[in-house]
Swiss-Prot record:
It is found in: Plastid, Chloroplast. One of the primary rRNA binding proteins, it binds directly to 16S rRNA central domain where it helps coordinate assembly of the platform of the 30S subunit. Keywords: Chloroplast, Plastid, Ribonucleoprotein, Ribosomal protein, RNA-binding, rRNA-binding. It comes from Buxus microphylla (Littleleaf boxwood). PROSITE patterns: RIBOSOMAL_S8 (PS00053). HAMAP family: Ribosomal_uS8_B (MF_01302_B). This is Small ribosomal subunit protein uS8c. Part of the 30S ribosomal subunit.
């Protein structure tokens, strides 16, 4: 039975968000680094740093906090395509989340990217997750 690293990222961020923790520690792989870069660029997390611990690399992500209250933003992440059921879409049928307010992360032939980037480049791919 294989590991689903994308589901691990989503679960870690969701659990830290519900538990009102400020940071999340995620095992570092190429896929996780690309997804965390997208989350950082889109403003869902504040800061990311790479941490080495006994020959293993981890990404330590700081969740985005509200200015008025000290709790983190409620970020909803949903895994779509999974190892048992892959979901693919062409660029014209990529769903829009909350009318464009949320993002869809796709795995394409040109790497992992958001739905906006995939539409601009005119390529589809595997729908990894929704974030809003």
């Amino acid at each position: 039975m294989g590991r689903d690293t994308i589901a691990n990222i989503i679960t870690s961020i969701r659990n830290a968000d519900m538990d009102k923790k400020g940071t999340v520690r995620i095992a570092s792989t190429n896929i996780t680094e690309n997804i965390v870069k997208i989350l950082l660029r889109e403003g869902f997390i504040e800061n990311v740093r790479k941490h080495r611990e006994s020959n293993k690399y981890f990404l330590v992500s700081t969740l985005r906090h509200r200015r008025s209250r000290k709790g983190p933003y409620r970020t909803i992440l949903k895994r779509i395509s999974r190892p048992g059921l892959r979901i693919y879409s062409n660029y014209q049928r990529i769903p829009r989340i909350l009318g464009g307010m949320g993002i869809v992360i796709l795995s394409t032939s040109r790497g992992i990217m958001t739905d906006r980037e995939a539409r601009l480049e005119g390529i589809g791919g595997e729908i990894l997750c929704y974030i809003w």
